[in-house]
Regions:
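"A position-specific structural signal for the A-helix of alpha-solenoid helical repeats
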Residues: 1-2, 35, 68, 101, ...
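Acidic, glycine-rich loop-and-beta core segments that form the ion-binding/anion-interacting portion
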Residues: 1-55
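Intrinsically disordered, low-complexity, charge-biased linker/tail regions
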Residues: 1-24, 63-71, 79-101, 150-220
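Residue at a conserved register position within TPR or TPR-like alpha-solenoid repeats
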Residues: 5-7, 36-40, 69-73, 106, ...
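Structural motif corresponding to the intra-repeat A-B loop/turn of tetratricopeptide repeats
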Residues: 9-10, 42-43, 59, 72-76, ...
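Residue register within tetratricopeptide repeats
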Residues: 13, 47, 79, 113, ...
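Start-of-helix register in tetratricopeptide repeats
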Residues: 31, 64, 97, 130-131
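TPR/TPR-like (Sel1-like) alpha-helical repeat modules
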Residues: 43-64, 123-129, 139-164
Length: 220
């Protein structure tokens, strides 16, 4: 998987071969499925993308898989991508990644009703920092309601954290083959970190989150 990751841009043929080898051996591995999905999508092989992503999503739902699935076919409209992701989400109705993927894609499609519908069941009992940030995006992009945006961003400070790639107390935006601390293989796991990853003040965090929302992105 690490080799496929390293040559994804420079040698896509080799990357596909390596990613598919890893995917075949372990259908629950996110990174090889995401790599293969992106590369097959770039070649217009939509059916292959769908099959690979669906196999892994059912075993290990993950945002990177949802993104690869959404962009499985070049030239699709935001509405097309939303419908595709909704179909994927239906296969894992009990995973929080399913409604989050739908809400994220709905926001990109400016379908505020669908975005709110996806997130509403999470607001009581399953609230997380990502959910709060998505709600802030909805309030900002749909209504330009700065007050509501800041309310939701303020709630991220005390909301439960979301899973991230983490190994030995280190958080990474992407999966890595080895721990930067111990060098151990396969150390990075997709899970909620035990300790805070930053010592920034609450005010600094709110400023950063507000900037991210204004850019239409989400924190990792």
């Amino acid at each position: 998987t690490a080799q496929a990751q390293a040559v994804e841009d420079s040698n896509p043929d080799r990357a596909i071969a390596l990613a598919m080898e890893a995917h075949t051996l372990a259908l629950d591995l996110v990174e090889p499925a995401a790599i293969a999905g992106r590369l097959f999508a770039s070649r217009g092989q939509t059916a292959k993308v769908a099959r690979i992503i669906e196999q892994t999503w059912r075993r290990a739902p993950h945002p990177d898989l949802a993104i690869a699935y959404a962009y499985a076919r070049s030239g699709d409209s935001p509405r097309d991508r939303l419908e595709r992701v909704k179909n994927l989400a239906r296969t894992t109705p009990h995973s929080i990644e399913a409604p989050i993927a739908v809400a994220t894609t709905a926001i990109e499609a400016h379908d505020w009703v669908e975005a709110r519908k996806a997130l509403t069941p999470l607001l009581e009992g399953r609230l997380s920092q990502r959910v709060c940030t998505l709600m802030a995006r909805i309030e900002g992009e749909q209504h330009n309601d700065t007050g509501r945006v800041r309310e939701w961003l303020a709630r991220t400070v005390n909301a439960p954290r979301d899973p991230v790639w983490t190994a030995d107390g280190i958080i990474s935006d992407v999966w890595a083959a080895t721990s930067p601390v111990t060098g151990a293989l396969d150390a990075f796991q997709w899970r909620v970190p035990v300790e805070a990853a930053t010592t920034a003040s609450d005010a600094d965090r709110l400023d950063k989150l507000e900037e991210l929302v204004s850019l239409g992105t989400r924190p990792r």
